[in-house]
Amino acid sequence: MHTSIQRIQQTFSQASTVLSIIAAIVFVVSYIQLVVANVWSLPEANFNLRGSKAARRFSRQYGANDPKKGKENVALKFDLDADLSPLFNWNTKLVFAYLTATYDGKRDDIVNEITIWDQIITDKDDSHIKLKGANSKYSLYDVEESFRNRNATVKLHWNIQPHVGAKIYGSLDATKGSIKFPQLV
């Protein structure tokens, strides 16, 4: 006959195995639902740049290594319209959406990407993003001294954080999704 400790250990071992199998099934089924909904080819996000303004900031908080020299920072004003409701199913805990601008670096082999705005969406009812005249959430600055009138391409990225399973990533192209960074005046 087995002791009480061995019986308890066997029960917990079997329960954890069954729960692991159920968790794997939940993740696979919810992933299949996302594939069927074709979430990796959602319609484009409508992005419209309303304005941009460059300024020189003299704080380490704004990226300046030498507070006396300062660093060029850019603030953007934009409109954004995107429907992320197909990303939600019964296993979705939240969707993290963020808008990025990608531009060439000093050398040809360098591509820079900066985050303009982000939002955590916890409910399917709030998943249609409609922003009018929104300001960039973060101070935009480059490791170099200036953006030097560079052009940037805008994309809306998302990642799904499920209740069970691994994160799922994707992105949407933005219509009119380009920015010409202004010159510092």
UniProtKB/Swiss-Prot annotation:
Assembly and interaction partners: Component of the signal peptidase complex (SPC) composed of a catalytic subunit SEC11 and three accessory subunits SPC1, SPC2 and SPC3. The complex induces a local thinning of the ER membrane which is used to measure the length of the signal peptide (SP) h-region of protein substrates. This ensures the selectivity of the complex towards h-regions shorter than 18-20 amino acids. SPC associates with the translocon complex.
InterPro entries per UniProt: SPC3
Domain of life from the UniProt record: Eukaryota
TM helices/strands, residue ranges: 17-37
One Pfam family named in its UniProt record: SPC22
Descriptive protein name: Signal peptidase complex subunit 3
Organism: Yarrowia lipolytica (strain CLIB 122 / E 150)
Summary of the function given for this chain in its UniProt record: Essential component of the signal peptidase complex (SPC) which catalyzes the cleavage of N-terminal signal sequences from nascent proteins as they are translocated into the lumen of the endoplasmic reticulum. Essential for the SPC catalytic activity, possibly by stabilizing and positioning the active center of the complex close to the lumenal surface. Essential for viability.
One Gene Ontology cellular component: signal peptidase complex
UniProt keyword Transmembrane, yes or no: yes
The entry's keywords: Endoplasmic reticulum, Glycoprotein, Membrane, Signal-anchor, Transmembrane, Transmembrane helix
Lumenal side: 38-185
Residues carrying covalently attached carbohydrate according to the record: N151
Gene name per UniProt: SPC3
Membrane topology: Single-pass type II membrane protein
